[in-house]
Structure formats: C-alpha cells, structure tokens
Amino acid sequence: MNILIPMAGEGSRFKVCGYEHPKPLIEIDGKPMIQLAVETLGLEGKYIFVIREYDNKELTSRLENLLKSIKKDCIIVKTSTLTKGSTATCLLAKKYFNDNEKLIITNCDQLMHWDSKRFQNFIDDNSDLDGIAITYDSLNEKNSFVKLDNNGYASLFKEKERISDKALIGLHYWKQGKDFVSSAERMINQNNLSQNEYYIAPTYNYLIN
C-alpha cells in the first residue's frame, strides 16, 4: 500500500498565528507535527512525501532528514513552487503510485486517535470498494463534506460547502492509485476548482460519475 502525504503548502494559518517554522516542523509536545501525524496514523506501507523546497536550505535538509528518520525507505519529492492545491501537489509524485496498488492520501497536520488495525481489516474485508473516506459529524463549513445515498454509499463530495452533516477527516483511500490519478487529472483538465484550489475530496466524484 502506498501512503502519500503532501506538505508543500504555505501553512498560512500557522504563520498568521505567529509560527515561524514550516508547518511539518512545528513541535507538539516535543515532537515535530509530521512525526506525530505518521506515528498516530499507524499504517504500514510505502511512504511518499511531497515537500516544499524552502529558500532556507537548512530547513529543507532538516525536514528531509526527519522524514528519513521516521520512515527510512520513504520517497521524498520536492517542489520549489506553490501548487494550486493538494491534488496538484499529489500529482507531482504520481509516477510512484499510478498503478494497481492501494493508495492512502492523508494530511500532514492531523493527529489520529483511532484503531488503525480495524481500518486495515475493513479495507481487506471490503475489497469491492473503489474508495473509502472516513467521516465525523460536523456542520462547520471549513470541512469537506459527503452526501450519502439511501444505501449509505457516497453520492456527492463537496469542499467547503455543507451538503450534509458528514464531514471528512482528511484521510482518503483508493483501491487503486491509478484511479486517483485519472480522477485528479480529469478534475484539473476541467478546471474544476473549489475555493480557487484543487482539493482531494472532489476527485471522488469522478469515480461516482
């Protein structure tokens, strides 16, 4: 299974709050945020990180060394420019997951309090599902949302638009990585932006349709 973590954004919300270091390196309880994100995710696989190549080369080197210490066999893809959103960032590494292998894309700034083995078992027991998104109940417009059909399957995904009370936590799964790539490329080719960015969740709509 490939596990992709994009982290090439500006981290503008953290900058506004006064943080000077790049978001992945901000410490929480003595550990960098990205280290806690990986540790609490608790899933085994081939880790792929897409990172920003900072003007400060020392920070870039520090982040690379940290990622290799967390997952020694990880793949690191660097970009010197800001992309048009997380989907565009993910596609910078597509040659590493544009295949039939399972793919998970998750955030670099979330700490998971969950049973990762239960999730892995759910994937294994439901191999007929092309994609899985984990939700929680929320009405906050800052989230991604999914609408369910009468059978409990996803029928529509929207970014920053509350179409239900089912918000996504920011962990996305595809049975085949190539399905994400084809959906993402279609979304970008159609210039289907959400809030002027290409987000991950709306790519699922291309599997539904």
Predicted features along the sequence, with ranges:
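A general structural signal for well-ordered alpha-helical segments in protein cores
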Residues: T60-L63, C90, A154, G177-F180, ...
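Short, conserved catalytic or adaptor-binding loops enriched in Gly and charged residues
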Residues: L66-K71, K147-D149, Y206-N209
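The conserved acidic donor/metal-binding loop of glycosyltransferases
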Residues: N107-L111
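Catalytic core and acceptor-binding pocket of nucleotide-sugar-dependent glycosyltransferases
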Residues: N192-N209
